[in-house]
Amino acid sequence: MSDVAVAETPAVKTPTKAPKANATKVPKVKTAAAHPPFINMVTAAISSLKERKGSSKIAILKYITANYKLGDQVKKINSNLRSALKKGVASKALVQTVGTGATGRFRVAEKTAATAKKPTVKKAATGEKVKKTVVKKTVAKKTGDKVKKAKSPKKIAKPAAKKATKSPSKKVAPKKAAAKPAKKTAALKA
């Protein structure tokens, strides 16, 4: 009888776990979004709104919800919009004219619009880039020569009469006056 008991125990041990049939899972197919990435929607909204001081987050949100299928999850839409605005400002694709973070007003950066047009030109003429850099270097050398020429007349003017020394000071004063309005216009543009 002990032999029978031994024979039964191996029978119990033999049913080991078979490989799972679930191991061959069907990969989940991701459904394509019904809308483009949020940063693209934001730039499209800002460019179409054409507000002088820039577009607010609320105006951008209204435009996006009216023109794209986003669903009913308002909290997700707001969080995605906020993150898109912050990333756009960080990557310099957007310029924040007023406010901080996701509040305030936003404009599309002028550089991004210019760079979007330039890549087609750059692809066609890659050899011209090298020539342009060479031209820039020669221009820099010429400006150095002009500075040297400007210094030599000043040395000649010093031994001259006192009237000659007064005239350069008059020239300096108008340059400062001209520089101040330029700063004001730069501040007004920004």
UniProtKB/Swiss-Prot annotation:
CDD domains, alphabetized: H15
Gene3D superfamilies linked: Winged helix-like DNA-binding domain superfamily/Winged helix DNA-binding domain
Region (Disordered): 1-29, 141-190
Bias-annotated ranges (Basic residues): 148-183
Any single GO CC term annotated in Swiss-Prot or TrEMBL for this entry: nucleosome
Compositional bias ranges of the Low complexity kind: 9-29
Subcellular location field: Nucleus; Chromosome
SUPFAM superfamilies: Winged helix' DNA-binding domain (SSF46785)
Single GO molecular function: nucleosomal DNA binding
UniProt keyword terms in alphabetical order: Acetylation, Chromosome, DNA-binding, Nucleus
Gene Ontology terms: biological process: chromosome condensation; negative regulation of DNA recombination; nucleosome assembly
Record's keyword annotation contains Acetylation: yes
Record-linked InterPro entries: H1/H5, Histone_H1/H5_H15, WH-like_DNA-bd_sf, WH_DNA-bd_sf
Modified residues (N-acetylserine): 2
Domain H15 span(s) in chain numbering: 34-110
PANTHER family: HISTONE 24-RELATED, HISTONE H1
Family: Belongs to the histone H1/H5 family.
Function of the protein: Histones H1 are necessary for the condensation of nucleosome chains into higher-order structures.
UniProt protein name: Putative histone H1.6
Native species: Caenorhabditis elegans
